[in-house]
Amino acid sequence: MFRQIPKFSVIRASCFASRCFYSSKSSNATYIASLLAEYDKTTNRSKKPRLKSRNDPKPSFKGAKAKKPDRHINQTGKERDREALKVVLDEVQSKYKSNNAIVILPTGNLEETQLSKTSLTLNLDEHGLQVVGEKKDSKGRSVPLVKVVDRQTAIKNYSDYLHQQVTRKFSSSFRKAINTSNVANKDPWKVIKVSWNISPQDLASQKCNEIEQMLNKGQNVYILIGSKGVINKSIDNPEDLFNEQHKREVSLDDIEALRRQKIVDTLDSMLETLPTSSIGNDGSISDKIIYKIKAQPKKDDKDEKKRLKELKKQERQEKIRLRTEKKRAESKA
């Protein structure tokens, strides 16, 4: 509402600068009014808008710009139709490393062209592509033979592709789990050989510790006690040593019989303290003795079986989901 009035010092300085002095009040008032008018002109002149310069920063606009559609991608049809087309193009590119193809048109005619151009001219609401084979082009090169098919066939092929991917994924996981389980159980029975000539110290420190370690790992164990001629043989199945042709019983004096019996008693005492699910033995101290010891199943084995069962369940659920989705897509088509 009120106009800004210059300070009196500015007005007074202007008076002396013009070498004018007014004695009367009216004359001074007139002169002050003229100074105010001149001040207004100067102020308004300085407030004129400045012309834009090329160095002025460009104004920034908030918000993302709308993304332009890619002119190299077919924009017709639904997203599923475009995904089905992309699978065919990727398959051709990965196998042939080329864009050339021979296309079977809906009319039945063959056209040697670039597959990317053909894909852009398709109306995906009505048609799709399918690789049906391989053919030599005019230059003698092997190129894919691609057929223009109806939309329903293209969607069915895409559903089959997804089903194969899921099956391959779960089969790979299942095979990996099976291989891991097989590696763990590659040698389900370990043969530990003990000579009748072993010293009590070696039996207690070496052989007993070896047996204990195997059983604690969940490893099933054969313990074969015999003469050096028996334990040095290559043995596939220790139980085969106890048929009639392998029996070689010898007469023992009291000292040797007592020593061998002590070895057997030491093993029996040790096995009572170890984690076993079953213990069986056969033979006699006058020939050879075999222990068949089955270890308690480890907790890891149970967890592994549970994981394999869960993988199978997931695979079944995924197959059902894909089958349902495939039927839904075919019904819409």
From Swiss-Prot:
<feature type="compositionally biased region" description="Basic and acidic residues">
    <location>
        <begin position="71"/>
        <end position="80"/>
    </location>
</feature>
<feature type="region of interest" description="Disordered">
    <location>
        <begin position="43"/>
        <end position="80"/>
    </location>
</feature>
<comment type="similarity">
    <text>Belongs to the AIM23 family.</text>
</comment>
<protein>
    <recommendedName>
        <fullName>Altered inheritance of mitochondria protein 23, mitochondrial</fullName>
    </recommendedName>
</protein>
<feature type="compositionally biased region" description="Basic and acidic residues">
    <location>
        <begin position="297"/>
        <end position="333"/>
    </location>
</feature>
<feature type="transit peptide" description="Mitochondrion">
    <location>
        <begin position="1"/>
        <end position="28"/>
    </location>
</feature>
<dbReference type="GO" id="GO:0005739">
    <property type="term" value="C:mitochondrion"/>
</dbReference>
<dbReference type="InterPro" id="IPR029427">
    <property type="entry name" value="AIM23"/>
</dbReference>
<feature type="region of interest" description="Disordered">
    <location>
        <begin position="296"/>
        <end position="333"/>
    </location>
</feature>
<keyword id="KW-0496">Mitochondrion</keyword>
<dbReference type="Pfam" id="PF14877">
    <property type="entry name" value="mIF3"/>
</dbReference>
<keyword id="KW-0809">Transit peptide</keyword>
